[in-house]
């Protein structure tokens, strides 16, 4: 994630995906720290203020829903009860709400809203004209549609009493939808990849549909004294007047203009200040050859072994999940869904991705810890082993709990929340497992922190790099905490706000900066770059990235029941996130150049190539495909379609997964620098993994997503997610095309896992030598 160009008296840095900086002056380090801290404080102040507005203006949850004829349609607490039913069944892993979730089953908000609108239109058509709504004349239909839009968009929520008053026709529509969803969840649906008996309790089904009703009501009812709904008119539904808001269009334009201007400024800066590189400090021999591993460094080997196995298991779950999308409930005809339903395999697929990537990064941090202070802290190996056991407990315990929750093995109490499935994508694990993971991260912070604090007492030129390393470590450990900030009965909009703190800030924010610092340490240990110069680059890298990344969290919340202020800030600052990614080509070139600086660096060639792949996927997966869906007007039509999957695979695996593989390889190389690697196998795995991912995206996910987008724009969001569209011959063929890329990717992954495990279980001979010196 970092490459640096240096001169003796000044330094031009290409940092974090290609951003450039000209280093001059003796007070530069101090100024960079002030810049980073200012960005950090100001950005979180804005994000926090927007959060207070989100909480204040979240869609109200009615105390009860009552028809004008006095019938109580939804009694007290039934909507929140329904949200809990939805969560325990798998929540976002079985369809989506407000566009957030999985892709095979419908978006339940859009589906309920469309079915309700159709029912009302047909009910009125039969009553007034004696015929079905589909047979009305244009004039007759226009009259009823205008009436329908008035009905659906008028906000009849009584703030003083907490009641929502609805027309009796909406109560009849509710009962009709209840019957439909009862059939879906009781009998199962192959079109939706929902297993038979997913939910057969009639009481819970009524609660579930009450929750669906509320999300649909909030998506169409205008905010008080406004002409847009609580979700900024998402999802697209022409029948009820849900069209893009003016703010969505205006802020899209602003974000695009800002992006172009920022890229232009960066090109201007680079063209004016780029200098040649001085590599005179690179040693003639590998400084790691002959170094003795500390006990804690040896103890990290089992972490990398688990990384390999979890990576493989994630691929297996992905293969099964993809087949469910085509076959409905099986794998090549084998009916697995009654034992291992889609909602479980997809949960495990997404969660295992987070687990193995995080494990790789945590292990890399633990491996580097002795490098920081130059010695092995007391009981460090014991701490590393305890943390390993805790991580295994969280992984296995959370997976078992999720299966039990979905399969109704945890009873009717609250155990589903504490030990089962919370229903929120990427943070699906039960609260107990969440808390255990947080405690494990604090232990990891302690293990690394004591090494860093000891090193900070020494007067060396790498103190800023160590302090930055400690800060990013603290960020990773502490910023998982927002995942504990919501409760079992928390408002969905509030949950979404904190959830994206974890998914975006934790994974895409602090992991990104942590990776920059870790790689800086690794290259500094090899003496390819100087530690103080690396600190300059890493500090400015973090400042620039976080200036867009922190507030850019809000781009996930455009339509989650949030006010327009979230859309405005999110669109502008998410555009700034893209700017560094445009220059990743420079990073790739510099990484390759570093690998050729001395003959001995050739043994790091394929490690460096994995870093180059990170730069490539940063541009394509995070940059191109990220900005494809980030502008408000684009996300309005694309959210929750396969275009989202394109970005998710290209960014989460492409950037963070590839970086996890690269860090694993780097540590394994550093453990045995004198060992000869089977580079043919590693080269094959590298090309197969990356080509396979490209095939998966361009042969299947992207074409499906673009066709869905066209359908969403021309017909409505509900249609783009409907089985009538997704089960057409063209879409089915495109889904099967994914098998080509998946197969190539899986073969490459198998080769990588075999290569890595072979290194770990058959260690080469090492030459005894004194303990390594700290980074100079």
Residue ranges and their predicted role:
Residues 93-97, 102-141, 371, 378-448:
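Hydrophobic or amphipathic alpha-helical targeting/insertion segments
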């Amino acid at each position: 994630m970092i490459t640096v160009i240096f001169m003796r008296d000044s330094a031009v840095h290409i940092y974090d995906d290609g951003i450039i900086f000209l280093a001059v002056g003796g007070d530069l380090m101090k100024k960079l720290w002030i810049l980073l801290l200012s960005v950090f404080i100001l950005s979180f102040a804005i994000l926090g203020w927007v959060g207070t507005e989100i909480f204040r203006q979240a869609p109200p949850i009615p105390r009860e829903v009552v028809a004008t004829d006095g019938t109580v349609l939804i009694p007290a607490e039934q909507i929140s009860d329904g949200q809990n039913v939805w969560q325990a069944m798998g929540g976002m892993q079985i369809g989506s709400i407000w566009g957030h979730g999985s892709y095979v089953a419908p978006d339940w908000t859009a589906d309920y809203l469309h079915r309700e609108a159709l029912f009302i239109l047909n009910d009125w058509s039969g009553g007034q004209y004696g015929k079905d709504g589909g047979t009305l004349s244009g004039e007759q239909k226009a009259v009823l549609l205008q009436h329908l839009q008035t009905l659906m968009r008028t906000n009849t929520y009584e703030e003083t009493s907490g009641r929502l008053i609805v027309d009796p026709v909406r109560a009849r529509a509710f009962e009709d939808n209840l019957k439909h969803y009862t059939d879906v969840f009781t009998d199962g649906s192959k079109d939706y990849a929902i297993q038979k008996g997913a939910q057969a309790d009639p009481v819970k089904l009524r609660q579930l549909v009450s929750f669906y009703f509320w999300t649909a009501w909030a998506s169409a009812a205008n905010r008080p004294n406004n002409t847009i709904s609580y979700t900024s008119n998402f999802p697209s539904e022409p029948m009820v007047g849900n069209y893009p808001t003016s703010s969505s269009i205006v802020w899209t334009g602003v974000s695009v203009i800002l992006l172009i201007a920022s890229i232009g400024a960066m090109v201007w800066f680079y063209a004016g200040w780029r200098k040649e590189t001085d590599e005179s400090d690179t040693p003639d021999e590998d400084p790691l050859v002959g170094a003795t591993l500390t006990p804690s460094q040896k103890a990290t080997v089992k972490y990398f072994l688990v990384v390999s196995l979890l990576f493989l298991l994630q691929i297996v779950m992905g293969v099964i999940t993809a087949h469910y999308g085509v076959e409905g409930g099986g794998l090549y005809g084998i009916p697995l869904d009654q034992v291992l339903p889609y909602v479980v395999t997809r949960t495990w697929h997404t969660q295992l991705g987070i687990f193995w990537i995080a494990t790789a990064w945590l292990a890399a941090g633990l491996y580097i810890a002795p490098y920081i202070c130059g010695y092995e802290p007391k009981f460090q190996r014991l701490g590393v082993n305890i943390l390993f056991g805790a991580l295994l407990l969280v992984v296995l315990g959370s997976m078992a709990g999720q299966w039990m929750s979905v399969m109704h093995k945890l009873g009717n109490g609250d155990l589903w929340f504490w030990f089962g499935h919370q229903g929120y994508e990427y943070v699906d694990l039960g609260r107990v497992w969440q808390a255990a993971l947080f405690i494990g991260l604090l232990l990891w912070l302690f293990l690394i922190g004591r090494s860093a604090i000891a090193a900070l007492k020494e007067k060396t030129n790498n103190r800023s790099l160590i302090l930055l390393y400690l800060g990013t470590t603290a960020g990773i450990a502490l910023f998982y905490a927002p995942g504990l900030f919501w409760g079992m009965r928390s408002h969905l909009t509030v949950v979404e706000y904190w959830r994206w703190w974890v998914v975006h800030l934790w994974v895409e924010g602090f992991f990104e900066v942590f990776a920059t610092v870790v790689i800086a340490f690794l290259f500094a240990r090899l003496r390819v770059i100087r530690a103080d110069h690396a600190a300059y680059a890493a500090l400015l890298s973090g400042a620039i990235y976080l200036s867009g990344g922190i507030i850019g969290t809000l781009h996930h919340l455009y339509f989650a029941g949030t006010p327009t202020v979230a859309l405005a800030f999110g669109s502008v600052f998410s555009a700034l996130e893209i700017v560094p990614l445009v220059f990743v080509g420079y990073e790739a070139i510099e990484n390759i150049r570093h690998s050729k600086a001395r003959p001995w660096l050739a043994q790091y060639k394929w490690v460096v190539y994995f870093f180059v792949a990170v730069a490539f996927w940063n541009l394509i997966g995070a940059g191109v495909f990220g900005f494809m869906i980030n502008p408000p007007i684009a996300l309005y039509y694309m959210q929750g379609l396969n275009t989202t999957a394109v970005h998710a695979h290209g960014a989460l695996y492409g950037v963070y997964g590839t970086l996890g593989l690269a860090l694993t390889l780097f540590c394994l190389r550093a453990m045995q620098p004198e060992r000869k690697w089977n580079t043919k196998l590693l080269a094959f795995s590298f090309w197969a993994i990356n080509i396979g991912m490209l095939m998966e995206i361009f042969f299947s996910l992207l074409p499906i997503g673009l066709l869905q987008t066209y359908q969403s724009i021309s017909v409505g969001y509900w249609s783009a997610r409907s089985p009538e569209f997704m089960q057409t011959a063209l879409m089915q063929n495109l889904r099967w095309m994914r098998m080509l890329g998946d197969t190539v990717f899986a073969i490459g992954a198998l080769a990588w896992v075999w290569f890595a495990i072979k290194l770990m279980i058959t260690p080469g001979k090492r030459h005894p030598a004194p303990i390594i010196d700290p980074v100079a």
